[in-house]
Regions:
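Bacterial N-terminal signal peptides that target proteins for export
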Residues: 2-15
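N-terminal signal peptide c-region/cleavage motif recognized by signal peptidases
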Residues: 20, 25-27
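N-terminal secretory signal peptides
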Residues: 29-80, 86-88, 93
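Active-site-proximal beta-strand/loop segments in catalytic clefts of secreted hydrolases
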Residues: 38-42, 65-69, 99-102, 122-123, ...
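Mid-chain, structured segments of secreted extracytoplasmic proteins
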Residues: 72-118
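C-terminal partner/receptor-binding element of secreted or periplasmic proteins
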Residues: 115-161
């Protein structure tokens, strides 16, 4: 019995293997999730947002959290340059966050936030059952807006605690 394959059959097998190999990375990229970039006292919103844009390919979800005084970039009163960068983040697949605690303490007026900005809660107090045991999210949170990676979600909640 001849175990040698015909050139056409070998070529077809090679093409199928190449097609699968090319398809897998694209599918893996669609599942990939970028990091969290925090605009805080020493790191402006524009700098954090540009870092997120530079480190994540278009379409890969990443996250930008703005803490006071950098939250102005997420409002209707944002400067032209801040609004431009903010819009670039959203167009590239970025998610914009503010902390719910900053809304609760009056540092941010939620009526001034542009559509699409998500208010995220920090960790509940120790001993609280606000997040059910074994879960990562509050029961009423829209998990589609939040990071899937545990490390990123923990950083986000820590920054807002």
């Amino acid at each position: 019995m001849n175990h040698l394959k015909s050139p056409a059959r070998s070529l077809a097998g090679l093409a199928a293997t190449a097609l699968i190999a090319c398809a897998l990375p694209g599918g893996a990229l669609a599942q990939a999730e970028g990091g969290l970039y925090i605009a805080e006292n020493r790191f402006s919103f524009e700098r954090a947002a540009k870092q997120g844009l530079a480190r994540n390919p278009p379409g890969q979800r990443f996250f930008v959290l703005a803490l006071p005084p950098n939250t102005a970039a997420l409002t209707q009163a944002a400067s032209t340059s801040a609004a431009t960068v903010r819009n670039q983040v959203v167009a590239a697949g970025g998610v914009l966050f503010v902390c719910q605690r900053d809304i609760d303490n009056g540092s941010i007026d939620p009526a001034q936030l542009v559509p699409g900005v998500v208010a995220v809660r920090g960790f509940p107090p120790r001993g609280s059952d606000a997040i059910p045991r074994g879960e990562r999210y509050f029961p009423d949170e829209n998990t589609a807006n939040l990071p899937r990676k545990n490390r990123t979600l923990k950083r986000l909640r820590s920054a807002c605690s």
